[in-house]
Amino acid sequence: MNTEETNVDLQDAETRDAAEPAAAEPEEAAQPAPAADADATEADVSEADLDQEEQEKQPMTGGGERPEDAPPAAAEAEKNGSVKLKIPEEEEEEQQEKFTGLNKEELLRVAGTPGWVRTRWALLVVFWLGWLGMLGGAVLIVLRAPRCRDLPATNWWNDGALYQVGNIAAFSAARDLKGLEQKVSSLSQLKVRGLVVGPIHVAPADSVEALSFEEISPEAGNPEQFKGLVQTAHKKGISVVLDLTPNYQGSSGPWFSNTSVTYVTERLKSALVFWLDKGVDGVLLSGVERVASVVPSQWADIRAIVQNGTEERPNKRVLIGVTERSSAEDVSSLLSSTGVDLLISRVLRPGSTDAMEHARSVQLLYSAHSQTTLAWGLGGRAEGHLASLVGPALVKLYQLLLLTLPGTPVINYGDEIGLMDEGNKFPKMLWDSDEELNGTLQEERAERLSCRSFFRSLSERRVKERPLLFGDFLLLSNSSSSLAYLRVWDQSERYVAAFNWAEEAAVLQLSGAALPQQATVVLSTNSSDLPADSSVDLTNLRLGPGQAALLKFPYTG
């Protein structure tokens, strides 16, 4: 039913309703009445008709008058079931007022107009031109930027210091391998990369017949303790190197006599396989020049067993040699002939304060060999501890020297705290405790803690700074009592290490194209004289007696 039919029906209904009272009027009018009453009756009828029409216009509510704040009558009528009618013309006007956008066909027609086509092409051209411009700029930046140097090939023993424990009983209160295992966490705090243990095998002095490489001396511990030590060290990121020097307690030499070298090396080869299968990460041998020259074929086999990886042992193992030679030329020749991964020598002569000799030896070895094969140490099983060799006042100076030279530093146990030899080369290790101490002992304890803190700071910086790990070595200044060198790597910060061995102050005048005028103090053996983070003049660098300092300055291109 359409709208017009609905309107007609409603109009017919209203006509019938209005006709009923109209039909009653003639009946009343037919009765005789006075003229005045007739006029009154007609007025009443007119008022009644008007009232009825007004009531029909009001909504069907429960009665009563509509309050003033009530909604409009039309809204109430819709709520009470009344129908609000709209003619077609009004609907068309409302639809025209509500714009809902273009449909698909209209959009396609508009998009195909010349104006929009030109706009799209212009925006597309701008986009691709911008993209190509950014690409070209990126390529130009890459081409013009300085290339980073490729990192050198290094091994785990080049990443930090090696820590030697030559006497297990002297290192801890437990006096065995279990006690050493309990101190691994303390060694980890020093950022050492390797732990050199022993010798711990059975080897009565000068008795080649009683030699047993594969048996642990009862004084050192047992196989289970050694297994626990290796596992704990590996968890802390520390590799374990085993000292297998044959005659380490005798006086006839580390390899006994020349006639017994062949017999000893044959037994050593089987022992190497045994210990490498136990998880050790390398082997140290003293007197390598003797075995390499007397039985070169046997020495080649030893090298192959340790240095060549297998499916069972894919990780790289280190072969460390030890020699008593001190001449830089002899050490360089031996390093080439033996083929060891590291060679510990006496190039840095104990007690020598000749800075010019130190500089010459370091420069010769550095120029002849890769720094990944160089090792620097002072003291050891045969020589004793650093503090006894150079004096307590120079311990920090030599710590700085060992940890900043190009190569691997090798530290004897206790050197980090300035431990002194007491009647023998294996003094008892001193560990910090909370027990009450008198004045003198308190001062000694404070000095040990200061020395250890200095070593730890140096070691931490060495393992994370590329110039100190594998950077180039440049000699800046050297005299009979002072030395300064530069460590640089690519675009990293530059480090200057300066030393004064003299008993009086020295002034170093460091200048050159690679040096700025100012540098920042990183560490100093005398922090009150050269505090950390202070600025110094490199052209007028003053060092006190026995003082050393590590400085840095930024890369400037």
What feature does the model see in each segment?
Residues 1-196, 202, 214, 219, ...:
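Carbohydrate-interacting/catalytic domains
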Residues 189-192, 277-281, 288, 340, ...:
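A structural motif
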Residues 263-329:
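Active-site neighborhood of glycoside hydrolase catalytic domains
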Residues 164-175, 209-223, 254-266, 281-296, ...:
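The substrate-binding groove and active-site-proximal loops of carbohydrate-active enzymes
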Residues 174-188, 260-277, 392-401:
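Short, acidic/polar
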Residues 200-206, 244-257:
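Aromatic-lined carbohydrate-binding surfaces of glycoside hydrolases
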Residues 255-257, 303-434, 489, 497, ...:
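Conserved alpha/beta catalytic core and glycan-binding cleft of carbohydrate-active enzymes
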Residues 188-192, 215-253, 263-264, 271-276, ...:
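Substrate-binding cleft of carbohydrate-active enzyme catalytic domains
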